[in-house]
Amino acid sequence: MSFALAFPVFDPVAFAIGPIVIRWYALAYIGGIVIGWFYARALIKNRRLWGGAAPIPLIAWDDFILWVTLGIILGGRTGYVLFYNLDFFIAHPIEIIELWKGGMSFHGGFLGCVIAVLAFGWNRKLPVATLGDLTCAVGPIGLFLGRLANFINSELWGRPADPSLPWAMVFPTGGPLPRHPSQLYEAALEGVVLFVILALMIRAGALRRPGLILGSFIGLYGVARIIGELFREPDPQLGFLWGGLTMGMLLSVPMVIVGAIVAARAWRRAPLTASASAGHT
């Protein structure tokens, strides 16, 4: 017997102010950046987490937000163009700048963030590993909101599920088959679980080992994404790749390896002392 749920009807527009229309996906980006900004400021101001003053000044973090926002948007769009739909955008290059139609890649956005961290850190002569730690500490917030927006938009739905699965759902654009609400799985794994793990690590003193949160985020996100991809329908223009893998899996495997290496190296280094971590607030 089928118990598939009907997908709830959501308006893709969160709200409108005159001619200005704000969609849920845009609101997720805005919310993730703003909430993440405040959360990172709280981490910077908590001297106990650093064993002294944080190596990143508050004013520097405030300036960095613009850099990382550009990295997320430009990197996310570039990654989607290159990794997921290159042939289409070669034929329709003008659509590359039409961001309101959707099409962003986490892996591209992450690379954009890496470039922003490196460029800003070197420009301001700040510890790049610590800047990366702060950026990755807030990352799950945006991931959680972004996956909820994917669900609201009825996009990136899951693979067909057993009709007896209590939470199997029929999506408006997914045909008649009940499917896994994989967006919610990913919101839980990439957002809630990853945030809790990193928060517990920070509470235990991980910020005193520059690069530990950075490496842990990279590796754990890769694991979470690979698990999520097991339930997510592959992008139709790509389908399954070698050995039944998806593009998301292929892009995430290197993250697991790189993350483990970065975290291991950070763990082997001696933790910051009060004098070594002294910075500005």
From Swiss-Prot:
Its EC number is 2.5.1.145. Pathway: Protein modification; lipoprotein biosynthesis (diacylglyceryl transfer). It is found in: Cell inner membrane. The keyword DNA-binding does not apply. GO terms for biological process: lipoprotein biosynthetic process. It is an enzyme of class 2 (transferase). It is a multi-pass membrane protein. It comes from the Bacteria. GO terms for cellular component: plasma membrane. GO terms for molecular function: phosphatidylglycerol-prolipoprotein diacylglyceryl transferase activity. The chain crosses the membrane at residues 24-44, 56-76, 102-122, 126-146, 187-207, 211-231, 238-258. This is Phosphatidylglycerol--prolipoprotein diacylglyceryl transferase. It comes from Rhodopseudomonas palustris (strain BisA53). The lineage of its organism: Bacteria, Pseudomonadati, Pseudomonadota, Alphaproteobacteria, Hyphomicrobiales.
